[in-house]
């Protein structure tokens, strides 16, 4: 038995000590982090790679253009310094002849410039002449074909073609006129410059021959410097273009970065839900009971008290019957009365143990009117109402007495004294009863008004 237990224990794998477990957990966490980083690197927006390549290319172009521009400027400066030094040495060597021959060389430069302008004006004039000749030939051919073909009609298309040809002829004539004027002006300037140059050449022939090496070297350096200046301008334009591409790539990367950050922020925040407390309020509204509210003890007691008073009034007086009938025509049960007020959740301590709700009180006593109309037993409206009811009762009693008298008069003379005594007794009983009813009515209304005040206080507190 012991040997079997030892064998089973030896077969079980030995548990690792706590430090070894912690090392393994750390290694697993590092592997997970590396996997997460690899996944993030895989999810990089492909546009970033393209924009980064453009950015690197623009950086290389900017560096290369800046180097080339610096070399060109350095070369321009070196050539300028070299020309200045050599021309100064040559001017000192030649001496005064350089200054004396300057007017001739200046006139020669102006004549050369006028010659170039005249040549350009001559080319423009020849081109305008050729265009005018071609337009005139087009019009002549169109007219000739129209005249040769007897069947051809002079339609709108033919008219439009002739109009275009005529317009080209007019434009060519205007261009020819302008180029002819320019050619005449440039030719006149060229002739004047050549005349002045020949005149100065005859006058300053010796100084011109002596200073000729100086001005030839100066012209050579001038052409070289012009070429270098053009190269510098081209490199500056290319550098500005490379900087523009670099700026555009930076803006694209910034836009992509903003989009990525916005997407991450929206993913972290999640979809927008309801506001704080919105779910609770919605749930409370949905869970509100749809059943009718329970009546309370005060409304039931007031209803019973009013029913008792009204039943007494109905049995004694017809006028009271009308008022009670108007009262009974309204809804008397909670199921018949509409809900004037929505159901509102309230604390359990304020619930009244009664089968009638406070919201139905206004429908149960329509005869009393609003609260402002009868606010107490001493109100003038209530006094007037009680007086009217008492007067109506007295009128009824007088009518009944008159009827009894008429009936007594129709009877024999023997029963007249008996009818009069019975009528007087009946009238006294009626008057006593009316006084009791008026007192009961006033007391009942005072109690009802007090109950109404209490109910309004409770209703206001609940709201």
Curated annotation (Swiss-Prot):
Keywords for the protein's UniProt record, in alphabetical order: Coiled coil, Cytoplasmic vesicle, Guanine-nucleotide releasing factor, Membrane, Mitochondrion, Phosphoprotein, SH3-binding
Pfam families: SH3BP5
Biased composition (Low complexity): 323-335, 416-428
GO biological process, one term: intracellular signal transduction
Localization per Swiss-Prot or TrEMBL: Cytoplasmic vesicle membrane; Mitochondrion
Entry GO MF terms: guanyl-nucleotide exchange factor activity; protein kinase inhibitor activity; SH3 domain binding
GO cellular component: cytoplasm; cytoplasmic vesicle membrane; mitochondrion; nuclear body
Primary site of residence: membrane
Sufficient for interaction with RAB11A and for guanine nucleotide exchange activity: annotated span: 33-268
Feature: compositional bias, Basic and acidic residues: 1-12, 45-54, 383-399
Biased composition (Acidic residues): 25-44, 309-320
Keyword Mitochondrion part of the UniProt annotation: yes
Region (Disordered): 1-69, 309-348, 372-429
Phosphoserine sites (modified residues): 354, 378-379, 421, 424
Any coiled-coil regions, as ranges: 47-93, 100-148, 157-203, 214-258
Functional summary from the UniProt entry: Functions as a guanine nucleotide exchange factor (GEF) with specificity for RAB11A and RAB25. Inhibits the auto- and transphosphorylation activity of BTK. Plays a negative regulatory role in BTK-related cytoplasmic signaling in B-cells. May be involved in BCR-induced apoptotic cell death.
Subunit structure, interactors included: Interacts with BTK. Interacts with all isoforms of MAPK8, MAPK9, MAPK10 and MAPK12. Interacts with GDP-bound and nucleotide-free forms of RAB11A.
Family, as annotated: Belongs to the SH3BP5 family.
Name of protein: SH3 domain-binding protein 5
Organism: Mus musculus (Mouse)
């Amino acid at each position: 038995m012991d040997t079997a237990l030892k064998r089973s224990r030896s077969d079980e794998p030995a548990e690792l000590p706590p430090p070894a477990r912690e090392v393994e957990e750390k290694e697993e966490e590092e592997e997970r982090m590396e996997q997460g980083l690899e996944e993030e690197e895989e999810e990089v927006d492909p546009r970033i790679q393209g924009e980064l390549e453009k950015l690197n290319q623009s950086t290389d172009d900017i560096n290369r253009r800046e180097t080339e521009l610096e070399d060109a400027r350095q070369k321009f400066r070196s050539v300028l310094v070299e020309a200045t030094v050599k021309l100064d040495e040559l001017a000192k060597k030649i001496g005064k002849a350089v200054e004396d021959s300057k007017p001739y060389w200046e006139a020669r430069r102006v004549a050369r410039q006028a010659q170039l302008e005249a040549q350009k004006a001559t080319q423009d004039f020849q081109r305008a002449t050729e265009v005018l000749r071609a337009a005139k030939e087009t019009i002549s051919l169109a007219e000739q074909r129209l005249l040769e073909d007897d069947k051809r009609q002079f339609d709108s298309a033919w008219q439009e073609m002739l109009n275009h040809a005529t317009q080209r002829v007019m434009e060519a004539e205007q261009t020819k006129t302008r180029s002819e004027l320019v050619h005449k002006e440039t030719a006149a300037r060229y002739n004047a410059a050549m005349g002045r140059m020949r005149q100065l050449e005859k006058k300053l022939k010796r100084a011109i021959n002596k200073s000729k090496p100086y001005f030839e070297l100066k012209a050579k350096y001038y052409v070289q410097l012009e070429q270098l200046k053009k190269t510098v301008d081209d490199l500056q334009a290319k550098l500005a273009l490379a900087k523009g591409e670099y700026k555009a790539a930076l803006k694209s990367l910034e836009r992509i970065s903003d989009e990525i950050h916005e997407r991450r922020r929206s993913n972290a925040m999640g979809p927008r839900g309801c506001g704080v407390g919105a779910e609770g309020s919605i749930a409370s509204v949905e869970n509100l009971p749809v059943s009718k509210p329970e009546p309370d003890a005060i409304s039931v007691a007031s209803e019973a008290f009013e029913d008792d008073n009204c039943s007494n009034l109905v049995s004694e007086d017809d006028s009271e019957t009308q008022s009670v009938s108007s009262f009974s025509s309204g809804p008397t049960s909670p199921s018949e009365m509409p809900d004037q007020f929505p159901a509102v959740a309230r604390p359990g301590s304020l619930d009244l143990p009664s089968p009638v709700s406070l919201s139905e009180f206004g429908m149960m006593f329509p005869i009393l009117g609003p609260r402002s109309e009868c606010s107490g037993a001493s109100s003038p409206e209530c006094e007037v109402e009680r007086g009217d009811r008492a007067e109506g009762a007295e009128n009824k009693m007088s009518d009944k007495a008159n009827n009894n008298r008429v009936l007594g008069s129709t009877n024999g003379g023997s029963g007249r004294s008996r009818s009069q005594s019975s009528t007087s007794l009946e009238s006294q009983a009626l008057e006593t009863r009316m006084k009791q009813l008026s007192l009961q009515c006033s007391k009942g209304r005072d109690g009802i008004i007090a109950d109404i005040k209490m109910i309004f206080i409770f209703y206001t507190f609940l709201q």
